[in-house]
């Protein structure tokens, strides 16, 4: 701080000649552009939340579907803001545009790590009946994502077990059947009844193909999203 204050007025004057001042036209225009961009971003998120709220109260599915489509058209195709990408992804999932949602999710994952989102990519691929090898690779990538997460969590933390479960489950879904025993080990590890029941239900969801299919059936999907 003292070094900054010690700069001479001459030095500051030279600096001002080579850079825009805070009240220069360029600075003002850039500030206004940023404010307008922020306002637009907030408008997209606000409208999405409003549609969801009304969908949960009085709005019918058809009206919500049309509003989602109209909102999607408002979002620029080259939008790169993380929060807007997340909102766009949610809209696409609601509309059943899973191929487009998959592409947007890849953009999100390039900006931020999320094991859950990575896992959903595999669900999308399964719903779209993509090549089994592509799905296997997706689950292995998910397992690696959970492994990275595990290494950042203290072992005593409750979410450590959830992340470990995610890693084992992804490996099992990738075809590594030896991880079935590791999943059972996590169930046996827990002696709190509520925790044990939660993991037992998750175990059933993985092992029971009907439970997995029921989950897939609940996801809307259309190959025509124009």
Regions found by a protein language model. Give the residues of each.
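Classical Sec-dependent N-terminal signal peptides that target proteins to the secretory pathway
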Residues: 1-24
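N-terminal leader/linker segments that initiate helical-solenoid repeat arrays
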Residues: 17-83
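Flexible helix-coil transition and linker loops at the boundaries of alpha-helical arrays
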Residues: 35-38, 70-81, 107-112, 144-158
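Generic helix N-cap/helix-start motif at coil->alpha-helix transitions
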Residues: 39-52, 77-86, 112-122, 157-164, ...
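Residue-level signature for tetratricopeptide repeat
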Residues: 53-57, 91, 124-125, 170
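Alpha-helical repeat scaffolds
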Residues: 64-73, 99-109, 132-149, 177-190, ...
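Alpha-helical adaptor scaffolds
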Residues: 87-96, 105-107, 115-160
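TPR/TPR-like alpha-solenoid helical repeat scaffolds
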Residues: 119-129, 154-173, 195-218
